[in-house]
Amino acid sequence: MKNRFVLPALTATAVVGNLIVVPAANAAEVGAEGASPSAGSRFSIGVLPDTQFYSRYSTPETGNLAQARYGSEPYLAQTQWLVEHQDELNMNFVTHLGDVVDQWNVEGEWQVADKAVQILDDSDLNYSILPGNHDMDVEGASAHPYDKWFSADRAKAANPETFQERYTAVNNDSEAHIFEAEGQKYLNLALGWRADEKAIEWAQSIIDQHPDLPVIVTTHEALNIDGEGSVFYSDDYGKDLWDTFIKRNDQIFLVMGG
């Protein structure tokens, strides 16, 4: 039986804008002599959820409505803000939750996203990224633009300190990162949109290679919310993800979805 991880300080989180702030804590095994997890100091993880409309309405095709209305491009402004404030927020890592663009077949949207994410590439702020349903032709079987603009080579070059590997399949890119915060290493598994059985097997193999690391799973789809504020699984996929992967791994202490 797997040792159960105790991470009480990490289960209560506060989401503020595009940040998640967590108390740092070392993982401790139940029954380990002298193990007494404590809160310690805090650190931040930058979160970029569903930037699709930032990409869409900053293109020439839309007359760059974002610039016209707000005087800036929101996608670019967000990544610049994250880089500029990383030290004061004690932030070593950013994660994108998918839907990088709104219309996968519009070149201009990818150019906007590329320019914004390049700000992270050029900094020492590492990040993970994953495709959402708007980033691909969900009905097609051919490679999609996501692979061109956000390739494994780019991820590796931009994130030399954290990037571990990329699982690449048609319409199903996932990647693994290990980052450190307050002396504790964390494994981030960024799962592509509706990651299939083989992708989940890959993710499980990464966890098995790192049995002592707390795990953060990021995905575009897990839970949903209705107009009355009730939270529920996103179709069958969210429940399957929970039943076949998340609840079977005590190391997973945080799941974020777009």
Annotated model-derived regions:
Residues 34-46, 172-189, 210-214:
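Beta-strand-turn-beta hairpins that frame and shape the catalytic cleft
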Residues 63-66, 105-201:
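Extended active-site neighborhood of metal-dependent phosphoesterases/phosphodiesterases
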Residues 55-57, 103-107, 136-141, 198-200, ...:
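Extracytoplasmic/secreted cell-surface and envelope-processing proteins
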Residues 50, 98-99, 132-133, 220, ...:
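Active-site glycine-centered loops adjacent to acidic/histidine catalytic or metal-binding residues
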Residues 1-27:
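Secretory targeting and sorting signals
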Residues 80-93, 173, 185-258:
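His/acidic metal-ligating clusters that form di-metal
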Residues 29-108:
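N-terminal active-site segment of His-dependent metallophosphoesterases
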Residues 71-79, 97, 109-116, 142-146, ...:
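Stable alpha-helical elements in mature extracytoplasmic
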